[in-house]
Structure formats: structure tokens, C-alpha cells
A protein has these predicted regions:
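Cysteine-dependent hydrolase recognition
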Residues: 155-954
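Sec/Tat signal peptide C-region and signal peptidase I cleavage site
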Residues: 32-35
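Bacterial N-terminal signal peptides
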Residues: 17-30
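Generic alpha-helix initiation/capping and coil-helix boundary signal
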Residues: 10-15, 20, 919, 923, ...
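Low-complexity, Ser/Thr/Pro-rich intrinsically disordered linker/stalk segments at domain junctions
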Residues: 37-177, 700
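N-terminal secretory signal peptides that target proteins for export/translocation
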Residues: 1-13
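Generic N-terminal simple sequence motifs
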Residues: 11, 27-29, 46, 92, ...
Length: 954
């Protein structure tokens, strides 16, 4: 692959980092003499190599960036701030290094990293400590920030961030516990019903956790929604199905005292934690909540790992898409998630507890059990033991930290965020149990899921509350799930401490989640309890402080029933009794809460009516954007319309509304584009994605909501990365069937800048010249200089060709910048690279500072990762070029992945043949055809066009 690869044998046990550090504005930072000696060396060796930096201005704090020359078995980094002579570690978890970035932890890949210190000032001194998988550390020379010119990628730094920011770390864990449930039903309503709902004015009610919600008439009006004059006609939908609600009165007009209540359910998918409910003012009576508890003959509604696509094509169609609506446990705003749920699995009173203590169950592999687990965790609710009067029930609590992004693990559509790193330092974390029933028969069950990091035999030793449970053994990137039987007497009422320790040196793994199922007393916790009962069981719930208890039966969450429980006073407060249900039913899912307890939605938004599904639609060019950038697309739309194209500018929220029930997911965009391509009266010829994307759509890292227009994260050969072409790859050959271009902007100012370059671009302003840059091929199997010789042979004779070869040009860096500033029609780079650098010749900071004004080239990059635009903290070269304020490029073609040069070169030769053919060709058409010249599926999927696919450069 055209990235800096170094022999594993030569690099074993060797790690060196050349570090760039950034503050709000940029400068070269010099080591602070003697500081390390004053502070102490730690257990590692201080690096004597100078640290170079380009630093940027943010609204508050210091933005630190550094780059490594190469890495071998690098676990990662710690970053320290030196304040008042004290060294303070800023990161709660190691900042993941090369072992998390590639399949081979000793492959020598150079990497880029960053951290945002909101408490930093120009006086703060920083130290970077590298840590290898054997626990050896090296503290690099300390640096003090200086100020330079601002950068576009820092324009949108959040003014208030709860957690530190780092390239692949999600920040500190928040240890708040909360009770949740996730019974999202399998049944999905008619897509026609959903299309009818979103084609009219509606109030979108956003729900992040399960609970009893209230929306008032003043809240409706404040969001811009007119609820109409008849409260009885308010109708609520989610997933295309009507939901029963309770209103403040049955019929008549609404006033400021009126409200609507309903049982809402949150969401937990890799892309979203927010479910959407749609409230409309209908012309008929809406579905209302009944007042009696009931049982259901189908008590286990659950959503499996994948759902069918929201629309279907005739059987003769080749394409049938699956909408991957991964419904898991709903999350709150905390990164650390301690989940409490109950289990439908009725425990046998005759179960025997293991007298010897914990008994491990054999591990399961993640691939073989991922689908099952996703379904299982939806229906593991409270269950009472088989008796007429339930003495206790089975409750499950889960802890799932999301701290580390592991891009090298190839696990399909499962998210690549994990928890604590288990390496040379043991990991301690707690999991909270409420009111364990110590007299219960049978053991508790502890389920642990791990993820291997490096390719060795792993052994992780597990202990609970100081008692060893056993070991989990696995290999490489396996994802074992292992269960231990634990005596209930070993649990504590409150925080239970888990310890994870590596079994041998160099063994590195990550905790995915921990789930503990235990017998729990039928006692309210903070005046509430979520539980399940079999229909033949009754129960008494103790521990309430108020007699006014609302009992909600949400067995069918679309048709919940509510009653006021009969409460009897006792010595501890109040207790309620639940009678037996229908003997023909299996179980009831119940929630007991005070009548005064209501939840507030996460947000209220006015739905903008849309009808993208109609086959009467048509457009040559689609511009899909975020609502904050829609207005900025107008100049580009006007330009193309003036050239005879029909243009449609589409809010991505409308796509979610129509194709994923309002849920944020990239699958909805593909489903929409497939429908447009196959049913619209005029199918689209080009697609522009106006807005950035992020590998962190859930904002675990606290960087901000940056997934404006999502990209698809695919498993390539070496890592997970972005593929925009996936959105229109309808035949699964790796390349787009409709040309796609990305403008990865985050602000209106960035959008105006990038679009103005396209709108004002004229081939007449650009010299008929090409700059071909080649990396030093010495020691590598592929000759980059010869590759550029072949490129040059494909260019017409009237194009002046300039060459910069790093191997023979000692001033290669300066000459690349000078030639770019002079203006070029075409720039081609062939060589090694990383996200923000061409090996030794050019980087993102250089790109931002270019001054070629309107003499803008098309830049083609044949290396690795320059198109890795979906990193929330780093700006790659491709996006830096098109966002450069005083020049840069009008478009760029670069890869988001790791690939080898052969397939790249085949594609680039075909691209130049097309671009300089007898007739001008649109960039998107040229790219689409050029990808057919390579059989390398990774090259096809990961090369991204940054620009307008409908434009031509000559």
C-alpha cells in the first residue's frame, strides 16, 4: 500500500514520534530546555528528537496535533499538561496508537493524532508520552504553544465540550446509572402510511430513552406546530404505526393547560440514539390509551438486528435493500452506559447454585452471535419466578463504555467504539446492582464481551469484588462473549467492582460490554420499578414514598394501558399489589412510577412536508445537504440550471423522514437514491453531498454533531473507512452507478467558500500545465517516478509538465508549494502518505496556506488516507485543498483507505485518458469510468471525489 511501510523485523520494539503540536494559531514550537529534568523522566526514556508543531486558534483552549514518523507495536499515547510545575494527565484512556489503526501492529505506518485542551493557554506546556504494548514508555520533549493563522477545521470547535477530544478516544467515562428498557417492536407500519404522515405538517418528537412523556400545547405552538381545534384528532405515529396516547381531555379545543402523554421508546444504533415520533392534527379521532392492565398473547415484541428496507421493488428487480435499523438499548447523553433492564426468561426455583463459586461458560464469537445478542438484549426484561406470587424478579444491568475508536477491527455494521483498554495496566470498573435478593435460588449470571486488539493469544483474567472468576482466552481480533455463574452472595447492593488483567506481556484487548443478570427484590428504586410478570403471577411492590402510583403496561408499546395502582401504607411507605392477568397470555411488561413523574422529549421539531417518494419527481443533479447548509447551495444550483440541468436541493432530514422513519442513518440515503434511480420520471445523473460526515455520528468523543450528511463505513482489507460511492453502488461492484461528489463542509462560511470556487471556476483562468509529484521509491516495490512517467505520456502535448521527485530534489517541499501557487490545471501525487501529509513533501497546513487564488487545479492523489475526511479531529489534505481560503483546489480525488499502488495506478491512467480525450468530460463521469479499470475493490470503494461531479476542468 502506498503508505510508509517499514519492515516488521526492523521495527520490533522500536517506536519514534515526531510530534506537531497545535494551539489556536500556528507556529514552530521549540523544546523547553531542562523541563523534563525538573519534572522527572517517568519510567521511560526522554526523546531527544525535536518536536515540530502547527497550532491553531480555537474559541477556548489549546488544540494539540502530533505526527509519528513510524510506529511499531504502539499502544498509544498519554498527553500531559504542565501547570505550576505539576504534570497533569489529560486523557482518561490511552490515545489509541498503531495497534488500533491497522491489522499488523508493527507495520510502521505513520499516524496523526490530536487533542483539544479547553483549559490550555499559551503558557501551558505539553508533553506527549508514547506507550508500547509491553508497557514501556517514552516521554518526548516538552512544548509550549505559539500562535499562527486560523484553520478552517477549527472554525466549528464547540465552545463547551464536556470531554477531552482526541483523534480516536471518546473522553472520560461518566458513571451515572439509569434504568432503561428497549422493547422496540418488530412490527413496522406501512411505508405508505409513513409517506402520508411526513407529507403534511407534523410535530417531530425526539425521544432518547424509554419513559412516560408529556408534550404541552404551549410546547407545540413554540415549535411552530398548529395542533388544530380538536384535541381528539391528535394522532401520534412512530415507525409508520399509530401510537396510543392520553390527552388532558377527550374532545374539544386545546388551550394552554392541555397536553398529550404517551409511552415513548429510545433508540440505540451505531448511528443514532434518537427515536422520532410524529404528531399530526388529523381529520379523525386518534388512538387513545385504555385504562385497564392487560396481557398479550405475543408478549415478546423485539427488533432483530436487521430490518427490511422501507420499500420493496418487484421480484424482477435485482436490488432489494435491507434497512439496518439496529435497535438496541437506548442511551442517555453519558458516554459510559450502565443499563438496567429485566428479563422475560423465567428462572426456575429449582435451579442449583454452584457451590464452588463462579462457573465460566464457553465463549462465543462476536460474528456468530452478534445478531442473536442484538435481539436478546431487547427482550431480557424482568421476570418473576414460576409461582403464583412472585417473590423477586430477574434484572439485568449492562455497562457499555464508548471510549476508543478501533478502526482496524473488521466487524461489519457493528460499531467500532469500545471501552477500556486492557494492557499492562489492569482495568477496574464498577457495575451497580439495586436490591439484590440474596435469598433467591440460583446464581447470578455475568456476561463479558471483549475485543482483541493485536494478533496474539489473549488471556484476560476476571475478578468480581475481589474474587477471581476465571479467564477468557481467545486470539487476535476475535470478539469473545463469555458468561460466568456468580453466587448472589458475592454481589453488593450498589457498586460492584470488576477487575480485568492481561495474562501475558504484549497482550492487548478492550472491554466491549459487561452484563449482569441477578435476582432483584420487588422493591421500588427512587419511586419507580420496571419489571415483567407472567400472566399467572401477582406481585407486591414495596418502597414507594407516595400513594399516587401510575402503572403502565407497555407489553405492546403501540397500545399501552395505564391504571392507577392501589397503594397501601406500610412501615416503609407504600406498597402496590399487581393482580394476576389473563391465563392465556405469557407475560406483561410493566412500569410503576409516581403520577407526577413525566419525561420531557429530547427535542421538538416542526416537520417540513416532503414527497421525495413520488415518481413524478425528477432532476439531473441532486444536492443533498444538511438544513444548516441548504441556503448555501443556491449559487451552485442556479449555475447548473443556467447550463440546462434540472437541480433538486434536498434536506437530508426529509430523506430520513421518508426512508428511515426519521432516524439518522446512511441506509436511508441509499434507499432514497435507489428509488430515485428506478422510479423517478427523470433519474438523477449526479449527486453532490454538501456537508461533512463523521465516523462518530453518536458524538461519543464530544467533538460535536458533525455527521451532516453520512458516509457509509465499510470494512476494507485493512481497516474500516468511508465509501461515498456505496450510496449509489446498486450492483455491489464497489463503484458508484450514479457519480457522487462530496463537499465536506461544516459551516455556512465553508460552504460559501467551496461553492464559490466551483461557481467561479473557468478553465481559461488556469495555465495549461500539470504538476507531477513523486515520492522516493527507494526500498519499495513500486516505482512512483515511473508511474508519473506513464501519467505524463497520457497528457496532450500542449500541456506543460512540471516534475518534482523527492528522491532527487532536496527542495521538494518548497518546489511543490511554489508550483501550486503558480497555478496548475492538474496535480498528481504518487507515493506514500497519511491523512494530512504527502511523505516529506506537502501537508494539510501547506494546503491551507496556498495562494494560487482562482488558478485552481484538479488534484489527483495516488496514496493512502488523504481522503480520510470523516475524522472529527483531523483535516485531511483533500478537504484542506478544497477549503483553502486563498487558493488550493477546485476538486480533489483521494482515498479514505489503505491500498496498494497497482490498482491505484491502473485507475489513474484511465482517468487521465478520459480527462484529456477528444471531448470534455464531467469529473464524475470520468471517475466512474476510471474505476472500472481496476479490479481492486478497495480502490473502487475508497477513492472519493471531493468536488462537483457535474463539472469539467477543460
Amino acid at each position: 500500500m502506498s503508505c510508509n511501510l517499514v519492515s516488521k523485523n526492523n521495527l520490533r520494539n522500536l517506536l519514534s514520534a515526531t510530534v506537531s503540536i497545535s494551539l489556536l494559531l500556528v507556529s514552530l514550537l521549540q523544546p523547553v530546555p531542562g523541563l523534563s529534568q525538573r519534572l522527572g523522566q517517568g519510567d521511560g526514556q526522554n526523546s531527544s528528537s525535536p518536536l515540530y508543531t502547527d497550532s491553531f486558534s480555537a474559541r477556548d483552549g489549546v488544540f494539540v496535533r502530533w505526527q509519528t514518523v513510524f510506529e511499531s507495536d504502539n499502544l498509544g499515547f498519554n498527553i500531559y499538561a504542565v501547570r505550576s510545575g505539576r504534570r497533569v494527565r489529560l486523557n482518561s484512556e490511552v490515545i489509541p496508537g498503531s495497534v488500533f489503526a491497522a491489522q499488523d501492529s508493527a507495520n510502521g505506518l505513520a499516524q496523526s493524532y490530536s487533542w483539544l485542551d479547553h483549559n490550555g493557554t499559551s503558557e501551558t506546556i505539553y508533553e506527549i508520552e508514547s506507550v508500547d504494548i509491553y508497557g514501556r514508555t517514552r516521554i518526548h520533549d516538552p512544548l509550549q504553544p505559539a500562535v499562527l493563522a486560523p484553520r478552517s477545521d477549527l472554525e466549528v470547535l464547540p465552545s463547551k465540550v464536556q470531554k477531552p477530544l482526541v483523534v480516536h478516544e471518546a473522553g472520560s467515562a461518566n458513571m451515572s446509572d439509569y434504568a432503561v428498557n428497549s422493547d422496540f417492536p418488530t412490527a413496522v407500519g406501512s411505508i405508505d402510511e409513513q409517506w402520508a404522515v411526513v407529507a403534511q405538517p407534523a410535530l417531530k418528537i425526539l425521544v432518547k430513552k424509554d419513559g412516560w412523556y408529556r408534550v404541552t400545547q404551549p410546547q407545540m405552538l413554540a415549535a411552530g406546530f398548529n395542533p388544530g381545534s380538536e384535541i381528539g384528532n391528535l394522532i401520534l405515529y412512530t415507525s409508520g404505526k399509530e401510537v396510543a396516547v392520553r390527552t388532558s381531555h377527550r374532545a374539544g379545543p386545546l388551550d394552554a393547560a392541555d397536553y398529550l402523554e404517551f409511552y415513548g421508546q429510545g433508540l440505540d444504533t451505531p448511528e443514532s440514539d434518537t427515536n422520532v415520533y410524529y404528531l399530526v392534527a388529523g381529520n379523525r379521532a386518534g388512538k387513545r390509551i385504555l385504562g385497564d392492565l392487560h396481557t398479550d398473547s405475543n408478549p415478546n415484541p423485539r427488533l432483530v438486528q436487521g430490518r427490511d428496507s422501507l420499500f420493496r421493488f418487484p421480484p424482477t428487480t435485482l436490488f432489494r435493500w435491507v434497512f439496518e435499523f439496529l435497535k438496541g438499548l437506548p442511551a442517555n447523553d453519558a458516554v459510559t452506559e450502565q443499563r438496567v433492564e429485566a428479563s422475560d426468561e423465567i428462572k426456575s426455583t429449582s435451579a442449583k447454585q454452584n457451590a464452588t463459586g463462579a462457573a465460566p461458560k464457553p465463549p462465543r464469537n462476536r460474528k456468530t452471535r452478534a445478531r442473536k445478542y442484538s435481539a436478546d438484549r431487547q427482550h431480557h426484561h424482568s421476570s418473576a419466578v414460576t409461582a403464583m406470587v412472585a417473590p423477586y424478579f430477574s434484572s439485568t444491568v449492562e455497562r457499555k463504555d464508548r471510549l476508543v475508536y478501533f478502526l482496524a477491527v473488521l466487524n461489519g455494521d457493528t460499531e467500532n467504539f469500545f471501552g477500556r483498554v486492557v494492557s499492562t495496566t489492569p482495568v477496574t470498573q464498577t457495575i451497580t446492582t439495586a436490591n439484590p435478593e440474596f435469598a433467591a435460588d440460583g446464581p447470578a449470571r455475568l456476561e463479558i464481551a471483549l475485543q482483541g486488539v493485536n494478533f496474539v493469544n489473549h488471556q484476560v483474567n476476571v475478578a468480581l469484588n475481589g474474587t477471581a472468576l476465571g479467564s477468557i482466552k481467545f486470539f487476535g481480533h476475535d470478539h469473545p462473549v463469555q458468561a460466568f455463574d456468580v453466587p448472589v452472595s458475592q454481589l453488593l447492593n450498589g457498586a460492584n467492582t470488576l477487575l480485568f488483567a492481561q495474562g501475558s506481556a504484549g497482550d492487548t484487548s478492550i472491554v466491549d460490554y459487561v452484563r449482569l443478570t441477578y435476582p432483584r427484590a420487588l422493591q421500588a428504586d427512587n419511586d419507580s420499578l420496571r419489571f415483567s410478570l407472567r400472566s399467572t403471577q401477582s406481585a407486591t411492590i414495596d418502597g414507594f414514598t407516595t400513594p399516587n402510583i401510575r402503572l403502565i403496561d407497555y407489553t405492546d408499546p403501540f397500545s399501552v394501558r395505564v391504571t392507577r395502582a392501589v397503594a397501601n401504607p406500610n412501615s416503609s411507605g407504600y406498597a402496590i399489589t399487581i393482580p394476576q392477568g389473563n391465563a392465556r397470555a405469557k407475560s406483561r411488561r410493566l412500569l410503576a412510577i409516581p403520577e407526577s413523574q413525566v419525561d420531557q422529549p429530547a427535542g421538538l421539531l416542526l416537520n417540513q412536508p416532503s414527497t421525495l417518494n413520488l415518481n413524478t419527481n425528477g432532476a439531473d443533479l441532486l444536492i443533498i445537504s444538511h438544513k444548516s447548509l441548504i441556503a448555501n447551495a443556491a449559487p451552485l444550483a442556479s449555475l447548473r440550471e443556467g447550463q440546462g440541468m434540472s437541480v433538486s436541493v434536498i434536506d437530508v432530514e426529509d430523506i430520513y423522514d421518508e426512508f428511515s422513519y426519521g432516524v439518522h442513518t446512511v441506509r436511508a440515503i441509499k434507499d432514497f437514491l435507489l428509488l430515485a434511480a428506478t422510479t423517478w420520471i427523470k433519474p438523477p445523473r449526479y449527486v453532490i453531498l454538501l456537508g461533512d460526515a463523521s465516523y462518530d455520528p453518536r458524538n461519543y468523543m464530544g467533538r460535536g454533531e458533525l455527521d451532516f450528511v453520512p458516509t457509509k463505513l465499510v470494512d476494507a482489507t485493512y481497516n474500516e473507512t468511508a465509501s461515498d460511492d456505496w450510496l449509489t453502488d446498486f450492483n455491489n461492484d464497489g463503484s458508484a452507478d450514479i457519480p457522487v461528489g462530496r463537499l465536506p463542509v461544516r459551516t455556512a462560511a465553508q460552504a460559501d467558500l467551496v461553492i464559490s470556487k466551483i461557481v467561479n471556476f473557468s478553465p481559461a483562468n488556469v495555465p495549461a500545465s500539470a504538476l507531477l509529484v513523486a515520492d522516493d521509491p527507494t526500498g519499495y516495490y513500486f516505482n512512483f517516478e515511473q508511474a508519473n512517467d506513464e501519467v505524463q505520456s497520457l497528457l496532450p502535448g500542449d500541456v506543460t509538465v512540471l516534475r518534482v521527485n523527492r528522491r532527487t530534489d532536496p527542495n521538494a517541499h518548497a518546489n511543490v508549494i511554489a508550483n501550486l501557487n503558480a497555478g496548475q490545471q492538474l496535480v498528481n501525487y504518487s507515493g506514500h502518505g497519511n491523512v494530512d501529509t504527502w511523505s516529506g513533501t506537502f501537508n494539510s497546513t501547506d494546503a491551507t496556506a496556498l495562494t494560487n487564488n482562482n488558478k485552481l487545479p484538479f488534484v489527483v492523489v495516488m496514496d493512502c488516507l488523504n481522503g480520510y475526511f470523516h475524522d472529527p479531529t483531523l483535516e485531511g489534505i483533500a478537504e484542506a485543498l478544497i477549503k483553502a481560503p486563498n487558493g488550493g483546489a477546485v476538486a480533489a480525488f483521494a482515498s479514505s483507505g489503505l491500498t496498494i499502488p497497482d490498482g491505484q495506478h491502473d485507475m489513474s491512467k484511465r482517468l487521465y485518458t478520459l480527462l484529456y480525450g477528444s471531448q470534455p468530460i464531467a469529473l464524475g463521469d470520468a471517475v466512474k469510468q476510471a474505476k472500472n479499470a481496476t479490479t481492486d475493490i478497495d480502490v473502487r470503494r475508497t477513492w472519493i471525489l471531493f468536488g462537483d461531479p457535474s463539472m469539467s476542468i477543460r
